[in-house]
Amino acid sequence: MILETSRHVLIAGAGIGGLTLACALRRAGLTATVFERADALRWVGAGITVQMNAAVALRRIGLCDAVAAAGASPTDSAILQPSGATITRLPVQQMQQELGTPMVCIHRARLQSVLLEHAGPEHVRLGRAVTGFKDDGHQVTATLSDGSSVTGDVLVGADGLRSAVRSGLLGDAPLRYSGYTSWRGISPEVPSARPGHVSETWGPGARFGVVPIGSGQVYWYATLNAPPGGQDTPGAARTRLREIFGGWHAPIPDLLAATPDDAIVRTDIHDRPPVNRWSRGRVTLLGDAAHPMTPNLGQGGCQAIEDAVVLSECLASGAPVEAALATYEQRRRERANQMVSRSWRLGQLAQLESPTARFMRDALFRLVPSSLAARGVRDLVRSAA
């Protein structure tokens, strides 16, 4: 077998997955160029938890410490009822110490900034999205939104839920609506919020998550069973959320009161059913472009990070492109697709409305010892590809 030790990788999308791939390829000595639709990487009001399995992947490319320094590590994690009563807890501080790996809660834009710095801003082309491609078997040419084109050895679609690369590779297929919408915001810390305490509260057809992300900020999110396509009138999002969640336990009302209405983002939650192929020829997919999932396990960005690290290892192996992409899929597809399915099922369980069903669910969760839940996290970390 002839090893291909020099190749240029085209990456569609400067999200977490695309930038992580660019970092990993640069570290491996390969050339990568990232093409991003947005004309600037803005501070969008959302946070992300880099779970321990993703931190393990980042350590393989030398980025774990830099990411950890930019965020905050939680000491405790719990699922609660609207009254504040505990359904279950996870001893995350103990697990971080045991596994020697951090869990990092961080502003999404801050994570993106760390990745951009290590990828090299000079390798990112803003305001130029990949809109199509042609693979001639020897090279792949990507068409860009400004009418130009660029040729490389590999094209990676890391362009998200509505990926143009995926559309060209697998065709158009409808998104699957979860049955619930979401709101996200960043609040300044409030006195009623416990430092280091991450929580998700389950109410009737609604949830509220609280995630301290460091730098005096708290990321929060809310979900509500609702038809797709709903919109809030300007200035009304916070009022509506306070009507729904204002009677829930602290610090939820205080976080909503401290968040400007124009800093609240609403998004319907979709995924796509898992597929059995991500690649064809010299083109492959990564992250939400390959396996978009609901956010219930907190694994969307984490699986994109895992994808990126594994794909970089496969491309750096020197194997022919098609063989490298086949190995990437073999290492990643089953794990990522399992996350899609598990996250979907958890969302349906967490969004229950029936009082009887919720009572039974909460009672069953209380019967599960925290040691068993912790074992599941350990297995996830230790099985990272």
What are these regions (language model features)?
Residues D232-R266, V321:
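Flavin-binding catalytic cores
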Residues S163, S182-R184, A206-G209, A290-H291:
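Histidine-centered metal-chelating micro-motifs
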Residues H197-G230, R238, R242-W248, I269:
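Active-site substrate-recognition segment that forms the wall
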Residues L41, E98-V104, G298-G301:
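Glycine-rich "substrate-gating" loop/helix at the edge of Rossmann-like oxidoreductase active sites
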Residues R366-A385:
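C-terminal auxiliary extensions adjacent to catalytic cores
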Residues A40-V56:
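Conserved N-terminal glycine-rich FAD pyrophosphate-binding loop of Rossmann-like flavoproteins
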Residues V9-D39, V156-G157, W183, L241, ...:
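Conserved mid-domain beta->alpha element of the FAD-binding
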Residues I2-V9, Q51-I186, V190, N225-R242, ...:
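Conserved N-terminal helical subregion
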